[in-house]
Swiss-Prot record:
It comes from Bacillus anthracis. GO terms for molecular function: ATP binding; pantetheine-phosphate adenylyltransferase activity. GO terms for biological process: coenzyme A biosynthetic process. Reversibly transfers an adenylyl group from ATP to 4'-phosphopantetheine, yielding dephospho-CoA (dPCoA) and pyrophosphate. SUPFAM superfamilies: Nucleotidylyl transferase. Pfam families: CTP_transf_like. Pathway: Cofactor biosynthesis; coenzyme A biosynthesis; CoA from (R)-pantothenate: step 4/5. Disulfide bonds: none annotated. Homohexamer. This is Phosphopantetheine adenylyltransferase. Its EC number is 2.7.7.3. It catalyses: (R)-4'-phosphopantetheine + ATP + H(+) = 3'-dephospho-CoA + diphosphate. Its cofactor is Mg(2+).
Length: 163
């Protein structure tokens, strides 16, 4: 049986922290779908298509990663892909509390889906897409925070010179 996992998020934009979780998940599972979810509570900076393109470029060297988007429930997407696992990265205890609520709801919706938590690498424990955008907005260097394709996209969006 093929083991298929879903790594979902808004990825607005994808960071090196996200990429670390995806790479580590790809070592454990046969296939990993990186799925951009349309979060109605967030106003995206990059369009869904832009985010998909950025993720595709950032993950192009990971052969068992596929990139997609979805606007419904994650468990429905997982069923559609015959996935048996959801991957979630944890930066801190505060992440766990939120993720536990989501995991409980997903389990209520589909008891066959397991959630796997991966602790983020310490060097990314402070990192979030929001922080990256804030740093880039004011011309700060994000070179150690995001893949090169994302750095270029941020500079273009904010029209700031590369540092």
């Amino acid at each position: 049986m093929t083991s298929i996992a879903i790594s979902s998020g808004s990825f607005d934009p994808i960071t090196l922290g996200h990429l670390d979780i995806i790479k580590r998940g790809a070592k454990v599972f046969d296939e990993v779908y990186v799925v951009v979810l349309n979060n109605s509570s967030k106003k995206p900076f990059f369009s869904v298509e832009e985010r998909l393109d950025l993720i595709r470029e950032a993950t192009k060297d990971i052969p068992n990663v596929k990139v997609d988007s979805h606007s419904g429930l994650l468990v429905e997407y997982a069923k559609m892909r015959n996935a048996n696992a959801i991957l979630r990265g944890l930066r801190a205890v505060s992440d766990f509390e939120y993720e536990m609520q989501i995991t409980s709801m997903n389990r209520k919706l589909d008891e066959n889906i397991e959630t796997f938590f991966i602790m983020t690498n310490n060097q990314y424990s402070f990192l979030s897409s929001s922080i990256v955008k804030e740093v880039a907005r004011y011309g700060g260097s994000v070179v150690d925070l995001v893949p090169p394709v994302v750095e270029r996209a941020l500079k273009e969006k904010f029209q700031t010179p590369l540092k």
